[in-house]
């Protein structure tokens, strides 16, 4: 990847389009497939055939029912979808700046999230799992039939490595994702119904096929590791630039994976706004180009490969769910006393989040999340009165955000919670208001009205 040394846009002519993130690959691909499905015809049949060719069947890698069979249809029930961005250090992904395959061999689950779609299709909850979380990884079957030893307190992003047995070939994706799926099911104590895998190279192709995305970079970035050098401001990010921003870690915020996940969630929210606003009806050529790139960028479970079978789920998720009812949350974690560079699930908060998904319920009171509008908020306590809403901030930036905070419960009220954990996982009322105002401001001013 060449160094990125850009200047903020000056309302001049710029090629414009839309942007997708590895963590939102499922919705990006399915949005176009659904539109084509609604129009019917040869184009739909051709794309469905291409999509079916990207199916990965993991039944052969089941150990004692680890890879549980799920119903043929998603209709009428809650659904949990695993989305994994792979961190391969070889081939095209390595050329894009992922690293040297001799340094970090094999496939890794660099970005992992679980998308929960409620049974009534009114709510989408997306839980990201930090890659440096220490978890139990079960025994996993390799494609040669051998089985790995189960491990405890292991790095979460080693799950794909163990399943793929250190391999990096296309044939290793199946056993790799099977191991990640089993690990997540063990961690969350719930069934994963479907999965999707995206790699770095595919991520870049998808974004470039869309034309890029407008995004407001909050501060100057100088990151040698990600090869990203960019001023603060409203930018049209290409696939290469967006990938660099996605990978950038130590040069932003506190340098943690948690803060990076938060920035990625902001990018996903920007994608949601752009995707829902795009008019594919008037630009079917652009849609076809994007879909062909997107389909080649992913591998999916058999039930997602049959788009027509589960169209009702996808249509509701992408076309009907209000952005305020889409919630991105990072699994609550804490720093273990024996290793400041790792994380462990923060209990009981982490278990409460997973139980909410398992039982198809709202996120627990006090949970920090980013909504589909890009605002970072806290789940309010319904028993606490809320203040009346303040006027929406104007498009002119002001020194003091005008949004009024929502009263929320303090997660530390739980007698079993560790107060130190709340520092990392809960937002103050002031931050809630500031972030909501910032999200509204960003949506109102980036991209500029003349773009």
Task: Give, region by region, the residue ranges found by the protein language model.
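Non-catalytic, solvent-exposed segments at the cell envelope interface
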Residues: 2-451
């Amino acid at each position: 990847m060449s160094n990125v040394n850009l200047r903020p846009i000056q309302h001049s002519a710029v090629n414009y389009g839309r942007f997708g993130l590895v963590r939102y690959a499922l919705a990006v691909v399915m949005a176009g497939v659904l539109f084509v499905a609604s129009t019917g015809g040869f184009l739909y049949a051709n794309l469905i055939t291409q999509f079916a060719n990207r199916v990965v069947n993991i039944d052969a890698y089941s150990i004692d029912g680890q890879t549980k069979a799920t119903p043929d249809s998603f209709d009428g029930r809650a659904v949990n979808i695993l989305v994994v961005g792979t961190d391969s250090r070889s081939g095209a992904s390595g050329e894009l700046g992922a690293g040297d395959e001799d340094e970090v061999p094999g496939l890794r689950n660099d970005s992992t999230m679980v998308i929960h779609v409620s049974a009534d299709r009114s709510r989408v909850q997306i839980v990201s799992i930090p890659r440096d979380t220490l978890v139990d990884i079960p025994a996993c079957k390799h494609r040669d039939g051998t089985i790995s030893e189960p491990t405890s307190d292991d790095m979460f992003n080693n799950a794909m490595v163990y399943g793929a047995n250190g391999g990096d070939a296309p044939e290793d994706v199946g056993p790799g994702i099977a191991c990640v799926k089993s690990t997540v099911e063990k961690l969350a104590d719930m069934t994963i119904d479907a999965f999707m895998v995206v790699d770095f190279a595919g991520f870049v192709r998808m974004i470039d096929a869309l034309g890029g995305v407008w995004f407001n970079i909050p501060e100057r970035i100088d990151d040698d590791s990600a090869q990203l050098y960019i001023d603060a401001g409203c930018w049209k990010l290409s696939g290469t630039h967006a990938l660099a921003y996605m990978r950038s870690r130590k040069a932003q915020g506190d340098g943690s994976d948690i803060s990076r996940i938060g920035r990625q969630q902001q990018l996903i929210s920007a994608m949601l706004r752009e995707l829902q606003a795009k008019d594919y009806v008037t630009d079917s050529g652009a849609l076809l180009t994007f879909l062909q790139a997107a389909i080649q960028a992913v591998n999916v479970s058999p039930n997602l490969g049959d788009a027509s079978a589960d169209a009702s789920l996808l249509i509701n998720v992408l076309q009907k769910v209000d952005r305020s009812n889409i919630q991105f949350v990072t699994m609550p974690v804490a720093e273990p006393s024996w290793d400041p560079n790792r994380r462990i699930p923060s209990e009981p908060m982490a278990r409460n989040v997973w139980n909410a998904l398992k039982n198809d319920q709202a996120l627990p009171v006090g949970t920090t999340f980013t909504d589909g509008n890009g605002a970072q908020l806290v789940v309010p306590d319904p028993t606490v009165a809320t203040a009346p809403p303040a006027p929406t901030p104007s498009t002119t930036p002001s020194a003091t955000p005008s949004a009024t905070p929502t009263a929320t419960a303090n997660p530390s009220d739980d007698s079993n919670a560790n107060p130190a954990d709340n520092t990392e996982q809960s937002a103050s009322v002031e931050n809630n208001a500031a972030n909501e105002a910032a999200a509204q401001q960003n949506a109102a001013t980036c991209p500029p009205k003349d773009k």
